[in-house]
Amino acid sequence: MDNCILEIKNLSHYYDNNGNKTLDNINLKIKKNEFITLLGPSGCGKTTLIKILGGFLSQKNGEIYFLSKEISKTNPNKREINTVFQNYALFPHMNVFDNISFGLRMKKTPKDTIKEKVKTSLSLIGMPKYAYRNINELSGGQKQRVAIARAMVMEPKLLLLDEPLSALDLKMRQEMQKELKKIQRQLGITFIYVTHDQEEALTMSDRIVVMNEGIILQVGTPEEIYNEPKTKFVADFIGESNIFDGTYKKELVVSLLGHEFECLDKGFEAEEAVDLVIRPEDIKLLPKGKGHLSGTITSAIFQGVHYEMTLEIQKTNWIVQSTRLTKVGEEVDIFLEPDDIHVMHKE
């Protein structure tokens, strides 16, 4: 990877003497100007990894190369890496200008340069008239923008963001997702973003790193992670999934609930037991007798954009999402195209 900005090699970390690893042999390459997201449930190790990359915590084993230089023993203030924390970490006794300019003033930057850089940063976050506003007069979203501006004004080559939007309400969070992606593209800074929110990761990322229990399970584009999960955990964690036991009968044919379906996945043995992943939005409902398998709708909930229905087929429950309502008690068939079925090896 010629345009690699950060490489993590065989990195492990544990907090106790029993060797229970918070991070277990992490290997990852990150490209320049990339928006990459560390995604996983609470306790998976993503925040620990961010702290290590920022220099706030030392790993037990492994190496970190930033612009081809090993930085494990480099102090945080000597790394061209800045961090935006979940709690903003703004100075309440300083106004917006002083908060954003704090790092520049510590570096003895000339006053005229500071003024120009802060002005540019405020414009970039859409707050050009807020320079002398007190921090306690700002909304949560505005505080987060100021925290981001304070990090960006130092012109880091890499920006770490540790769940920065988690305290915001849904609408503000969605607006800030768009703003962050826009800012990242304008500045050309590499972002490493931490979240447990799948929608956030899918919306903003160039690539997603899915983590669980201190290990990396899969790295890929949002489309790859969503459409081609490599493990049952990834399939279940990213969006909603129907995951069933099936059999890979022969090349490009699987069996599920006694019916054979065509599929697109290869690399399996004949008669191999497999996991079959079917997304709720990919299931087509047809009149009884017109599809592959028959079942009965047992629940239907309106969720704004679509209806989410539960379909019982041979004592298995299927989650189905559709813009058209099928009433509870109605008998229907399902129809699946080959690309609606994703085949995975059993773990």
Swiss-Prot record:
Residues 6-238 form the ABC transporter domain. Its EC number is 7.6.2.11. Keywords: ATP-binding, Cell inner membrane, Cell membrane, Membrane, Nucleotide-binding, Translocase, Transport. It is a peripheral membrane protein. One of its GO terms (molecular function) is ATP hydrolysis activity. GO terms for cellular component: ATP-binding cassette (ABC) transporter complex. It is found in: Cell inner membrane. Gene3D superfamilies: 2.40.50.100, Nucleic acid-binding proteins (2.40.50.140), P-loop containing nucleotide triphosphate hydrolases (3.40.50.300). ATP binds at residues 40-47. Disulfide bonds: none annotated. It catalyses: ATP + H2O + polyamine-[polyamine-binding protein]Side 1 = ADP + phosphate + polyamineSide 2 + [polyamine-binding protein]Side 1. It is an enzyme of class 7 (translocase). Its main location: membrane. PANTHER family: SPERMIDINE/PUTRESCINE IMPORT ATP-BINDING PROTEIN POTA, SPERMIDINE_PUTRESCINE IMPORT ATP-BINDING PROTEIN POTA. Part of the ABC transporter complex PotABCD involved in spermidine/putrescine import. Responsible for energy coupling to the transport system. Belongs to the ABC transporter superfamily. Spermidine/putrescine importer (TC 3.A.1.11.1) family. The complex is composed of two ATP-binding proteins (PotA), two transmembrane proteins (PotB and PotC) and a solute-binding protein (PotD). This is Spermidine/putrescine import ATP-binding protein PotA. It comes from Borreliella afzelii (strain PKo) (Borrelia afzelii).
